[in-house]
């Protein structure tokens, strides 16, 4: 049986008050809809609002919270980083890794992303591994090779039992 995941990334948007209103609206809309066992919803708020969202959705079946990123490190003197262990202790189930905006604005390499994937999996968090090409690469007809390299460098070091726990999100830029 294939399970569908619908994930909503809030990016760096909303104040605390807006986040509260937004999650209430999402919950109301989902309660009015069809959220069966074959469908899961993951809300991926900014870090400061993870706990707020978790507390609001904890009794709703098939409704989960994800993180927008995690550190490639388990712990230590990495100011501003949030470890997968910390995220799991909150109750986070999913983590976006390799989003095009982080690759671009934070110069994240495939090696760094592979370390983040490993951290997520080691802490029982399902990575949502993003891959995709920009228009220039697509128009040059190099998109297949480009995406395969992202996947190979980011995931193919993993054993099969860990790869199958990873969700791949294709996001052309």
Whereabouts are the PLM-identified features?
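Active-site loop-to-helix "anion-binding N-cap" substructures in soluble metabolic enzymes
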Residues: 1-173
